[in-house]
């Protein structure tokens, strides 16, 4: 049965900036301008009508509670933007340009595998691969006469081999995903401990031990799944922009940019 929740007079919520900024891969724009996505065991459509955000979906629980957690609706983004805007004009202008973006609270397992797949990849291809994995091994959920598929748990991927992943288009990432599944099933990667770890440095060290996880992927996982807002993922574009704006166009190494972000933005760097 379809549920609905309406967020009235919504501030700091612009679907296009949330779903098309590269933090998530299971959301797609619909013909009416809304977005439909699947996360965990929920399929939800998000539509903006004037100042209201309408959430409609086939959910595993109460849609309001699910949306509050996933979209971090209890966080005061107006206050956060106000604090960040005072740091410098570059950041102030960026906040105005990207107004309405929110950091989602995504599933750790799906986020981990998704960003391992993201290595040397582009967003359309990442989305295609994740959709193939989900359709092949996930559970089907129907919503508005269309079939959606959950991202498979480690247990669902237990018997999936390297060749199976390769046939889904993972390329060189197939062995990394295969090994990560195995390590998780053997509890060498403890997802529960990762979720409970409070120290960002300890968490980063543990994530870097996972096959296919480098510094950027580790920071993406911390920021987009574990609410570590001080995490600052550095890709080639972030590196270029920070180098140009703050270092007189002298290209800096990722570690230097990480240090700069920590000093400049503190625990809101992400």
Regions found by a protein language model. Name each.
Residues 1-270:
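HhH-family (HhH-GPD) DNA N-glycosylase catalytic core used in base-excision repair
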């Amino acid at each position: 049965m379809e549920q609905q929740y309406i967020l009235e007079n919504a501030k700091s919520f612009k679907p296009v900036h949330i779903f098309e900024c590269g933090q998530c891969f299971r959301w797609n724009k619909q013909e009416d301008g809304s977005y439909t996505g699947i996360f965990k065991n929920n399929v939800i459509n998000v539509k903006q009508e004037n100042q209201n955000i309408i959430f409609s979906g086939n959910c595993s629980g109460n849609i309001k509670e699910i949306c509050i957690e996933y979209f971090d609706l209890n966080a005061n983004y107006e206050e956060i933007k106000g604090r960040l805007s005072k740091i410098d004009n570059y950041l102030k202008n960026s906040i105005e340009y990207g107004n309405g973006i929110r950091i989602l609270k995504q599933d750790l397992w799906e986020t981990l595998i998704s960003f391992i797949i993201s290595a040397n990849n582009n967003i359309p291809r990442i989305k295609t691969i994740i959709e193939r994995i989900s359709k092949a091994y996930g559970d089907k959920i129907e919503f508005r006469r269309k079939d959606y598929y959950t991202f498979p748990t480690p247990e669902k991927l237990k018997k999936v081999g390297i060749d199976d992943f390769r046939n889904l288009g993972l390329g060189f990432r197939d062995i990394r995903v295969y090994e990560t599944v195995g390590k998780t099933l053997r509890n060498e990667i403890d997802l529960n401990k990762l979720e409970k770890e409070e120290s960002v440095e300890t968490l980063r060290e543990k994530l870097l031990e996972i096959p296919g996880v480098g510094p950027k992927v580790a920071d993406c996982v911390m920021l987009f799944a574990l609410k570590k807002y001080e995490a600052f993922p550095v890709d080639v574009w972030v590196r270029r922009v920070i180098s140009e704006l703050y270092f007189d166009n002298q290209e800096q190494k990722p570690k230097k940019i990480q240090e700069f972000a920590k000093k400049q933005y503190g625990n809101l760097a992400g």
